């Protein structure tokens, strides 16, 4: 992998991580059209996501520091556990359990079978349709303060599906939130906050394994990966700011059509033998 390829993949990661269109799918697809014509790998994707999640930490720093502070105060008995921010801290922990468990259990599949472009194309279309249905039929009346433990678990299960490229971490969790009746801003905000523990854990784990076992790195060096991560951070911050404004007055339908179109094009390219799965 060249430095130019690393920058391109960092741009792709930053542009697509928080849009409900699957960043892992785009990394996988774009990798096939770069000069190296190869899958950058699950480790590359996970490590570059550290950059995008750093953008979340900075954009939502007031929310995150408040939640951590109030949750810590509740744990030490200084405030009641019913405090809204302390409760949100617990709900983020609960919602992170499914992806943590399944990520460890299915690690080998995530690195191999799940990265088939046939699966990616299918998931792009299927979850695009599900996002459309949720956006169209969801009541969209519940604020984030109405989040329950049950809803937090369902959010977490939806996030776990994003272990399959093409599903989209944000797309899956946002669709789940809309289906449960949450407003677009509420569903989107919780999706971003919920991703922080899981993505940082996954990225740091893959970073550790790449450093201790270079054979797991894939077709890139650590230098190129870190450059891609830095690029992803800058771009992702701008995307978050734009998306939070966009969904306050618009639906997710443009992303739905994009997912279906991309999935269809991918099927055509695979069927014609232009790219390999």
From Swiss-Prot:
Entry's Gene Ontology BP terms: cell wall organization; peptidoglycan biosynthetic process; regulation of cell shape; response to antibiotic
Name of one Pfam family that matches: BacA
GO molecular function, one term: undecaprenyl-diphosphatase activity
Cellular compartment(s): Cell membrane
Bilayer topology term: Multi-pass membrane protein
A Gene Ontology term for the protein's cellular component: plasma membrane
Protein family according to the UniProt entry: Belongs to the UppP family.
Record PANTHER family: UNDECAPRENYL-DIPHOSPHATASE
Other known facts: Bacitracin is thought to be involved in the inhibition of peptidoglycan synthesis by sequestering undecaprenyl diphosphate, thereby reducing the pool of lipid carrier available.
Protein's name in the database: Undecaprenyl-diphosphatase
């Amino acid at each position: 992998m060249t430095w130019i390829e690393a920058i391109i993949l960092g741009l792709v990661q930053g542009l697509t991580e928080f849009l409900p269109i699957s960043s892992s799918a785009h990394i996988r697809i774009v990798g096939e059209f770069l000069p190296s014509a190869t899958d950058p790998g699950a480790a590359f994707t996970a490590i570059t996501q550290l950059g995008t999640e750093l953008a979340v930490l900075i954009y939502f720093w007031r929310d995150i520091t408040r939640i951590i502070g109030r949750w810590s105060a509740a744990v030490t008995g200084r405030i009641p556990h019913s405090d809204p921010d302390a409760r949100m801290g617990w709900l983020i922990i609960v919602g992170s359990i499914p992806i943590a468990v399944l990520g460890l259990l299915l690690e080998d599949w995530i690195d191999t079978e799940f990265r088939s472009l046939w699966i990616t194309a299918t998931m792009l279309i299927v979850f695009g349709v599900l996002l459309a249905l949720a956006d169209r039929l969801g009541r969209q009346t519940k604020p984030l303060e109405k989040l329950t433990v049950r809803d937090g678990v369902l959010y977490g299960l939806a996030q776990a599906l994003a272990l399959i490229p093409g599903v989209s971490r944000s797309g899956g969790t946002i669709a789940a939130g809309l289906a449960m009746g949450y407003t677009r801003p509420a569903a989107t905000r919780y999706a971003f906050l919920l991703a922080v523990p899981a993505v940082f854990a996954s990225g740091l784990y893959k970073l550790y394994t790449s450093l201790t076992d270079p054979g797991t790195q894939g077709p890139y060096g650590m230098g190129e990966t870190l450059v891609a991560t830095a690029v992803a951070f800058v771009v992702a911050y701008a995307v978050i700011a734009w998306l939070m404004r966009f969904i306050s007055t618009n639906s997710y339908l443009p992303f739905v059509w994009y997912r279906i179109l991309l999935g269809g094009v991918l099927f055509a390219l695979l069927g014609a033998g232009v790219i390999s799965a």
